[in-house]
Amino acid sequence: MIYNKQKKLRFLFYIFLSIISTLNWGSTAHRAMSEVASFYLTENANNKINEILDGETIVTVSTYADDIKSDSRYDKYYNWHFINMELDEDYEDTVPSEKGDLFIAINRCLDILESDSATDSERSFYLKLLIHFIGDLHQPMHIGRYEDRGGNRIYVKWFGRNSNLHRVWDSDMINGYNMSYTELAKNLPTPEKLEIEFERDDLIDWVNEVHSYT
C-alpha cells in the first residue's frame, strides 16, 4: 500500500537525519552514516529498500550522487548538492536557483518515491540521490554563504597542507581518524529515541538551523 511505502521511506529519512549530525561528509562519512542507519531498519523497510535498489545496499549507493558528477549527462543535478544563502537569510527569504538546490532536490526525491506513476528505475535513481542528499543536508558548508561559496573560497592550512574550509568539513577531519566506514559506524554515538513520523515542513527548519552554523 502507498501509505506503508511512504511510512517506510520517511522512517529511513529520519534515521539518517538523526545520525548524520555526528559525522563529517566525505565518502567515508556517507558510507558510515548508511551503515549505522541500516542497523535501525525494520525488516519490512529493509525489504522495501532492497526491492527498490534491486540488490544494492544503502551503503554502496550512498556516494552515487557524487560518483555521477564526472558524467556530463548528470550535470543538471550539480546544484542539488548545496544551498548558498546570505549570512542572515532564512531559506524562505531566498529566491531559489532555477537550477535547483538541496532543499528542492530532497523534496523532488520524496515526490518521486511517493508517486504511483514512478517507474522502478526512477525510484531507484531518486532513492540513491536522497540517501546522499540527506548526508549533504547536515554538512554546514553545503548550506553555506554566497560570498565564500560554502567555504570553498576560504583557504586554510590543515596540518600543514593547503585546503579549504569546505574540504576540511567534507573529508579532511574524518580522514584524520584513519578508520574505515565500518569502524566509524561502530564507534558513533547513536540516538536514544527515533521518531517514525517525519513532516516534510520540518525540512525547512533543518535547512535554516544548519545554515545558522555557517
What are these regions (language model features)?
Residues 1-32:
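Bacterial Sec-dependent N-terminal signal peptides
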Residues 9, 137-138:
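Residue-level micro-sites within transmembrane alpha helices that shape
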Residues 24-133, 140-214:
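N-terminal, motif-rich segments that launch catalysis or mediate targeting to/interaction with membranes
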